[in-house]
Amino acid sequence: MAAVKTLNPKAEVARAQAALAVNISAARGLQDVLRTNLGPKGTMKMLVSGAGDIKLTKDGNVLLHEMQIQHPTASLIAKVATAQDDITGDGTTSNVLIIGELLKQADLYISEGLHPRIITEGFEAAKEKALQFLEQVKVSKEMDRETLIDVARTSLRTKVHAELADVLTEAVVDSILAIRKKDEPIDLFMVEIMEMKHKSETDTSLIRGLVLDHGARHPDMKKRVENAYILTCNVSLEYEKTEVNSGFFYKSAEEREKLVKAERKFIEDRVKKIIELKKKVCGDSDKGFVVINQKGIDPFSLDALAKEGIVALRRAKRRNMERLTLACGGIALNSFDDLNPDCLGHAGLVYEYTLGEEKFTFIEKCNNPRSVTLLVKGPNKHTLTQIKDAIRDGLRAVKNAIDDGCVVPGAGAVEVALAEALIKYKPSVKGRAQLGVQAFADALLIIPKVLAQNSGFDLQETLVKVQAEHSESGQLVGVDLSTGEPMVAAEMGVWDNYCVKKQLLHSCTVIATNILLVDEIMRAGMSSLKG
């Protein structure tokens, strides 16, 4: 009888074999759900929420976030996989598959009486060897546009259909190349993702500038300005109450008039400064002048600015202030005391676009923009969400490739090569831990197997072909998903991120090891004692 039972008769306990069976069945269950959506030929899942909202996706991360998982072990695996996405942006489905398969392979040996500790020692040895081998097969190369496009395409094709993936690939790579500075880390926040419910998803495009999701607030302001100076500021151009609660007493109407005038004058002086600057830089030329303010602009000020032909946008989002100065140049001002032409940015074209009730302001044709916008278009909400998730992963894939300075061949090529290397390494491991290494090698093959299966080919036949080709040629050979034949992944431009594979080997081994070593599950928390 479990010791915990004597202390708490209501506790639920699962011992040794039962505990392991519970955990392994959870891992298998999760693996079966995600198995079919691995790779570019994977199938979609439809998630229907309690409110009846529909989400169509084959992104493992989105699925694991949205699915309500009751089983504690399964939710542990799901958390590991979503953490993988947070760190590297890819590899969630592979993560779940490999953990499930490691446990499945281990189960075969444990059912024959092998102790889990011995298998986990084998797993550790295999992981160390696999990481060494990964160092050998990684391909260090110049991260030019072609390579980055291959990396992004490999990632994006697993999230959305091929035609859309090709459109997004170019946009994603060009956006990263635009914001990239030498010897500085890439800041993905400098790529704004703006959505428009409009046209079809293949109209998604890269705007080399900014798109703001609001328009000018005055009917007389121009809807299109070419060759414009841009003043970015965070200065209030409306009457604001004083910070302390103060009251003014006046004896006559004249005094009240004076008070109102004094209050207005404060704002009018600021507006005059903008107008003077505009006259100074534009003169009589037809150059435009645009003010983008983070705070409010009241109707009087808008009117004064409109008369001078200045376009003014108020209440711009804070995150866009930094992006504006990076895209157009200039300096964001917090006061107008030292207002001079050096503070101004420049854009070749600023125009307003109205879509139903919504207005968008496009700031384009900037010289050498350091911040860009990906304009996501799609006919409905769930298409937009799907594209946004895909773009985020695509951006991360390109960033990882640049940060790593190297890539590894995809299409299951690395897994096949790793499995073969581990089988060769197996005899040098002492004792029964060899079985753990064998289990690890077999588990890695789940990736090429499932890739082939999802494409409609026989998984054993395809795997045998690929392994034979790998042994003969010595090259890293993956599965060609359109024919089911072996192919040299590097020649076809199928590349995966090195850091994703490295993270996969680490996290899968750690979690599988921990789950195998569980020999007792107790549900004896405070909540289960009530009743």
Curated annotation (Swiss-Prot):
Record-listed E.C. numbers: 3.6.1.-
GO molecular function: ATP binding; ATP hydrolysis activity; ATP-dependent protein folding chaperone; unfolded protein binding
N6-acetyllysine: residues carrying this PTM: K5, K199, K287, K365, K377, K388
Modified sites of kind Phosphoserine: S205
Amino acids binding ADP: G39, G91, T92, T93, S94, T158, K159, A411, D496
Binding-site residues, Mg(2+): D90
InterPro entries: Chap_CCT_zeta, Chaperone_TCP-1, Chaperonin_TCP-1_CS, Cpn60/GroEL/TCP-1, GroEL-like_apical_dom_sf, GROEL-like_equatorial_sf, TCP-1-like_intermed_sf, TCP-1_chaperonin
Post-translational modifications reported in the UniProt record: The N-terminus is blocked.
Residues where N-acetylalanine is found: A2
Localization, UniProt: Cytoplasm
KW Signal (keyword) present: no
PROSITE patterns the UniProt entry points to: TCP1_1, TCP1_2, TCP1_3
Expressed in which tissues: Expressed in all tissues examined.
Positions that bind ATP: G39, G91, T92, T93, A411, G412, D496, K501
GO cellular component: acrosomal vesicle; cell body; chaperonin-containing T-complex; zona pellucida receptor complex
Role description: Component of the chaperonin-containing T-complex (TRiC), a molecular chaperone complex that assists the folding of actin, tubulin and other proteins upon ATP hydrolysis. The TRiC complex mediates the folding of WRAP53/TCAB1, thereby regulating telomere maintenance.
Superkingdom of source: Eukaryota
Name of the gene encoding the protein in the UniProt record: Cct6a
Catalyzed reactions per annotation: ATP + H2O = ADP + phosphate + H(+)
Keyword Phosphoprotein recorded: yes
Protein name: T-complex protein 1 subunit zeta
Entry's family note: Belongs to the TCP-1 chaperonin family.
